[in-house]
């Protein structure tokens, strides 16, 4: 079977909907015993902290009959100067796949180039593809469809914004991205998303108007304003994003049955207020749970051969 990497949401362009449907089926049969990945070994290399991604990946591979090996970069020879390429060649001899959470996307690409096994981007500075499977799985569960939905991301034009645009475009969802001026998503991702959206009959709208994005939205999504590694920008970003907080006033512009989503962790009182995060419209913990089921879907798709 040919090696397949998932470094970007675009690597699931042809089967994202299929993976989501598989994930929903795996969730429905969560108490069934699976041995489809028996004896398969997943390596986890995490340069950044993780609660949901690491835990869900470890549980996911275990529930499918395989095993996870956590590799702390500071305890590997990577931390002493061994190249990513050499590391990839060696780990390919021991493992069946690697999930890599990195500060720099270039390192994820380099690892994938040097391995003979699948590499999964478990979050880097430009994308978070695993989160997208869980997010749109949640949308499918709550809304029952993708076509005709207005999905609004309001916040920083970061890695989540990049990946959400691509995921929405692939699935035919209209997406609005509202950010302060100067914090828009990278143009290369906007261009890629618009090209896919054109093919799939949906649209990608970039705006600086949070109310425009929230108006009649079916989904309102946000993420932290200060990403990992950006702590020095806290004061600057908090000032710039004040009008982009997800609060009761802003969501009053959305449809009454809108759902609120957040990839977590949430900085309550900054990008979202408690009354929204804890409202009946909030699905953030269902969304978090779906990290497990969606990653089972991804791993099954990559490794069940």
Swiss-Prot record:
Molecular functions (GO terms): amino acid binding; ornithine carbamoyltransferase activity
Chief subcellular location: cytoplasm
Binding site for L-ornithine: 159, 223, 227-228
Pfam families given in the database record: OTCace, OTCace_N
Described function: Reversibly catalyzes the transfer of the carbamoyl group from carbamoyl phosphate (CP) to the N(epsilon) atom of ornithine (ORN) to produce L-citrulline.
NCBIfam families named in the record: orni_carb_tr (TIGR00658), PRK00779.1 (NF001986)
Designated name of the protein: Ornithine carbamoyltransferase, catabolic
Protein's gene: arcB
